[in-house]
Amino acid sequence: MKTLRIGSGAGYSGDRIEPAVELAEHGELDYLIFECLAERTIALAQQARLSDPDAGYDPLLSERMRRVLPFVGRTAGSRRLRVITNMGAANPLAAAREVRRIAAELGLSGVKVAALTGDDVLAALQTDASRLMDNDMTLASLGDRLISANAYLGAEGIVQALEADADVVITGRVADPSLFLAPQMFEFGWAADDWTLLGRGTLVGHLLECAGQISGGYFADPGFKDVPDLARLGFPLAEVNAAGQATITKVEGSGGRIDTATCTEQLIYEVHDPAAYLTPDVSADFSGVSFQREAENRVQVAGADGRARPETLKVSVGYLDGWIGEGQISYGGPGALARAQLAREVVLERLKLTGVIVEDLRAELIGVDALHGSKLGSRATAEPWEVRLRIAARCVERSEAVRVGNEVETLYTNGPYGGGGATKAVRQVVAVASLFVPRDAVNPVIHLEDSV
């Protein structure tokens, strides 16, 4: 039975490049998938594209392609490696042009590069009266604060690009597991309504999509869940057959671990209802999934199912939501905690005295209460040797946000004593919310060209 080998080259935009190169060179892959779009990433990319029509794709696209394109295509006695990625972000067409340019620069002729567009529905929804799920606002009410609206496409557009013999497929917003499902549908001829097979293929994508998470990265917890050679963490690959049966593994000799424990943790990652994991392709059912150790760093996956796909597509909406002003300062030595607490009280009082207008405010002592607040009960009796005060506020106006960091900085000379390492920053908030649109309102389009 034919076996397809699919590797995960990235779990987010800024992920390491070396493990992907290791997969391309030593993984004997058919497909290398780079999943690089978090929820806010595409909104930030859209801002970049508005400033420069040739920008708006992943900042590491060029470096990644320069490293892996030499392995793409057919080589005597080996599999044909193809690349699929959502690094096109807000500008898949410009990203595809960049890939073709790099291929030419490397002397690689005939590399077929496809761009998948159609996820950008901003123009169609700009005056829409639909309400966002997260805050009950309408798109129309956001006005010029609205910067992006991208529908989550499924696997079918990528399948069409593969049918057109593309070596590299560049997309914008596509559901994460759909990037991995597409090559399975194409290679095995799975029908777009074979829900069981699509559910199994979606499980493979879900397990691989975060790259190093399943091979021990996010899993590692020294003394409880030890992971060997974490600095050389290898990214995962799946061996899949036409029945959707899969084995998760990694390149032999790479760092990390793949076992039933790492697979189980990744299985429940970002899953609300295991029996109804909704994607544009299928409502996947993970409730019967099981893992079995096949050998060291090899785990068999079984038990996924699926039902009919949703009639709507999720749209991720990015909009401007004010400014965050932040200031930090450290205190060390005897009495560090008391001085940091006094500093916090001083800044909070100063913000009131000077009339700084804030929408939300956090004032925390890093190392003491920044993550859990008072929820874990009283703190340990031992005095910390160092504490860092962080005060951050969200403001409507940038000028108000600037004043937050300025007040923290004035602690240098206005007490308490011994503060150091003060920093301040202001950044614009890009918020993300969601809504649903009818499936037929979104029209994916494939653009295909060869490198020179």
What are these model-derived regions, one by one?
Residues 121-171:
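An acidic, phosphate/nucleotide-engaging active-site surface
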Residues 109-113, 214-226, 274-293, 350-366, ...:
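Flexible, glycine/charged-enriched surface loops at secondary-structure junctions
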Residues 27-45:
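N-terminal glycine-rich anion-binding loops that anchor highly charged ligand groups
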Residues 198-305:
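A conserved active-site cap/scaffold subdomain adjacent to cofactor or substrate pockets
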Residues 302-452:
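C-terminal non-catalytic interaction/assembly regions of soluble proteins
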Residues 60, 104-121, 181-222:
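Catalytic or ion-translocation cores adjacent to nucleophile or general acid/base/metal-coordination motifs
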Residues 51-52, 77-90, 169, 388-395:
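Short glycine-rich or small-residue beta-strand-to-loop segments that form or flank ligand, phosphate
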Residues 1-22:
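N-terminal amphipathic/basic leader segments beginning at the initiator methionine
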